[in-house]
UniProtKB/Swiss-Prot annotation:
Entry domain remark: The self-inhibition loop inihibits the serine protease activity in absence of factor B (CFB) substrate.
Family listed: Belongs to the peptidase S1 family.
Name of protein: Complement factor D
Enzyme class: hydrolase
Region Self-inhibitor loop, annotated ranges: 223-227
Record site feature (Cleavage), residues: 25-26
Propeptide: 21-25
Keywords: Complement alternate pathway, Disease variant, Disulfide bond, Hydrolase, Immunity, Innate immunity, Protease, Secreted, Serine protease, Signal, Zymogen
Regulation acting on activity, per entry: Circulates in plasma in a mature but self-inhibited form. Activated by factor B (CFB), which displaces the self-inhibition loop. Associates with CFB complexed with complement C3b. Specifically inhibited by anti-factor D Fab fragment (AFD) antibody.
Disulfide linkage: 51-67, 148-214, 179-195, 204-229
Length: 253
């Protein structure tokens, strides 16, 4: 059995007493309009927010593979229809995870292939506050300067404050050549990855696995790589979903 498969089994069977800290790295953003992003998911470990996610089909949520690294002994669930993580909302529902499918080439020590598909225990109840997001299938780069939306429940300042309500920020896409400069990510950004500017506004810890949405279409997923949030020389890194269209389709089939 593949190591990721063993991990996924442990995730679904275990139940730990405490939750792991949120993974990933919205900084400098603002509170989102309630339920205006019905595709948003909170991937939770033992009842606490761990990572972002995006509903891509009635029974499937896309997130980041690295999110499971801290989850081997815990119970993973997915919260849909939420704006506030703690307050009661008619649209909120917590789903168990039937199957966790990390990309087969994902590895703990690299940001490449950092994708994870979570099959919900049943099809989500769709409505105005819960709806899948169309995702990009055409494998082409988003034009530099395009403003894209990132949303999540990740930390909102360098002191580590975690929001209860969904936050979002608009970020311009950065060209790959600039992102690969020695002073930035020094050649690490492959054609399967993309960058967005991070000058005091950025995705941050707890946002990993969340969506980068450009023109109403899912273009990228926040990676879990470790870096300083909001540093303009360390732009945000996102996995391009179009590069993995065949894999996503094969899992969802």
């Amino acid at each position: 059995m593949h190591s990721w498969e063993r991990l996924a089994v442990l995730v679904l069977l275990g139940a730990a007493a405490c939750a792991a800290p949120p993974r990933g790295r919205i900084l400098g953003g603002r509170e989102a309009e309630a339920h205006a992003r019905p595709y948003m998911a909170s991937v939770q470990l033992n009842g606490a927010h761990l990572c972002g996610g995006v509903l891509v089909a009635e029974q499937w949520v896309l997130s980041a593979a690295h999110c499971l690294e801290d989850a081997a002994d815990g119970k993973v669930q997915v919260l849909l229809g939420a704006h506030s993580l703690s307050q009661p909302e008619p649209s909120k529902r917590l789903y168990d995870v039937l199957r966790a499918v990390p990309h087969p080439d994902s590895q703990p020590d690299t940001i490449d292939h950092d994708l994870l598909l979570l099959q919900l225990s049943e099809k989500a109840t769709l409505g105005p506050a819960v709806r899948p997001l169309p995702w990009q299938r055409v494998d082409r780069d988003v034009a530099p300067g395009t403003l894209c939306d990132v949303a999540g429940w990740g930390i909102v300042n360098h002191a580590g404050r975690r929001p209860d309500s969904l936050q979002h920020v608009l970020l311009p896409v950065l060209d790959r050549a600039t992102c690969n400069r020695r002073t930035h990510h020094d050649g690490a950004i492959t054609e399967r990855l993309m960058c967005a500017e991070s000058n005091r506004r950025d995705s941050c810890k707890g946002d990993s696995g969340g969506p980068l949405v450009c023109g109403g279409v899912l273009e990228g997923v926040v990676t879990s790589g470790s870096r300083v949030c909001g540093n303009r020389k360390k732009p945000g890194i996102y996995t391009r979903v179009a590069s993995y269209a065949a894999w996503i389709d094969s899992v969802l089939a």
